[in-house]
């Protein structure tokens, strides 16, 4: 292979990596739209989404590990179990929060996770650079505008969204130190935990044919396909680029419900969200340490 051919091949891989990660972000961004179309109660939403996610992720793990499913789950270790528990909290809080506030509010709060992760890292001895404190301060101002502005979002929705973001930030910190933890089995186990928690509150009689399709789209499409595309793309491009491209989810999510359902975020929400996104982009661009590729709730 000539140098020119190798260069072209690397450029092609880089482009494919960007496309895969962008497709992951698009898949994740559909969560708010699908959830808004559901008529079932929140317990049924949680259990149904988790059940389909488990099926999809088990199939993915079986294919990726060439049938060694049990081996893959054993390999995640104690840290993988902790990650699964935190992801279960984050994933469950995500769906619950969508029932209390706008898609834009939930996703803008979710965008805080990388900045919060930098702060949580201090508890495991990671130094916090000045740029991180700047990003955190700006992000807090953005959240303050969203919460305290004239849009008056639900306090319950904002609080649950913050729980989602903090728990996901903890996942980022752990996976940054334990890059050997496989995210697919951990994500699958997290959905098993969500299913076990939500099952007593679920009512199968609430699920019609339309809701069944929507729950399948949430579980298999939004979670499963998103993780598959991320896994394919993250191998081909730098982690910092992955982190930036996945921010498409935060932009597209509110856009889908705005176009399809006329759920228009208020001016304060959009302004505050833009400030939060700006802080996260600043943190990602200026940080010399690449973040691990981690799928969101």
Language model regions located:
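Glycine-/small-residue-enriched transmembrane alpha-helix faces in small-molecule transporters
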Residues: 1-48, 85, 89-93, 141, ...
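C-terminal-most transmembrane helix of multi-pass membrane proteins
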Residues: 2-7, 50, 247-297
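Loop-to-transmembrane-helix transition segments
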Residues: 16-24, 68-95, 155-164, 199, ...
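Hydrophobic/small/kink-forming positions within alpha-helical transmembrane segments
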Residues: 29, 33, 51, 58, ...
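Transmembrane alpha-helices of multi-pass small-molecule transport proteins
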Residues: 40-89, 116-120, 167-171, 187-203
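Hydrophobic transmembrane alpha-helices of multi-pass small-molecule transport proteins
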Residues: 57, 87, 131-148, 160, ...
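C-terminal transmembrane-helix exit sites in multi-pass transporters
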Residues: 61, 96, 113-134, 251-271
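Helix-helix packing/entry segments at the starts of transmembrane helices
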Residues: 106-112, 174-193, 223-259
């Amino acid at each position: 292979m000539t140098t020119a051919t190798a260069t072209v091949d690397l450029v092609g891989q880089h482009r494919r990596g960007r496309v895969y990660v962008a497709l992951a972000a698009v898949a994740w961004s559909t969560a708010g739209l699908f959830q808004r179309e559901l008529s079932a109660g929140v317990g049924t939403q949680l259990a149904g989404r988790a059940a389909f996610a488990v099926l999809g992720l088990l199939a993915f793990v079986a294919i990726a590990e060439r049938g060694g499913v049990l081996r893959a789950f054993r390999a995640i270790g104690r840290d993988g179990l902790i990650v699964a528990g935190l992801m279960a909290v984050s994933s469950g809080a995500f769906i619950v929060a969508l029932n209390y506030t706008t898609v834009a509010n939930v996703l803008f709060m979710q965008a805080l996770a990388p900045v919060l992760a930098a702060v949580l890292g201090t508890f495991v001895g990671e130094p916090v650079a000045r740029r991180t404190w700047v990003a955190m301060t700006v992000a807090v101002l953005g959240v303050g505008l969203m919460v305290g502005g004239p849009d008056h979002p639900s306090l319950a929705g904002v609080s649950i969204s913050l729980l989602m973001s903090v728990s996901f930030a903890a996942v980022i910190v752990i996976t940054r130190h334990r890059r050997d933890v496989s995210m697919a089995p951990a994500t699958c186990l997290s959905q098993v935990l969500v299913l076990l928690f939500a099952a007593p509150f679920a009512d199968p009689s609430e699920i019609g044919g339309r809701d069944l399709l929507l729950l399948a789209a949430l579980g298999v499409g939004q979670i499963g396909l998103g993780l598959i595309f991320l896994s394919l793309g993250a191998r081909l491009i730098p982690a910092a680029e992955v982190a930036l491209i996945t921010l498409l989810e935060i932009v597209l999510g509110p856009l889908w419900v705005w176009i399809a359902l006329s759920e228009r975020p208020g001016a304060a929400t959009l302004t505050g969200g833009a400030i939060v996104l700006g802080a996260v982009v600043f943190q990602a661009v200026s940080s010399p340490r690449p973040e691990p590729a981690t799928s969101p709730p």
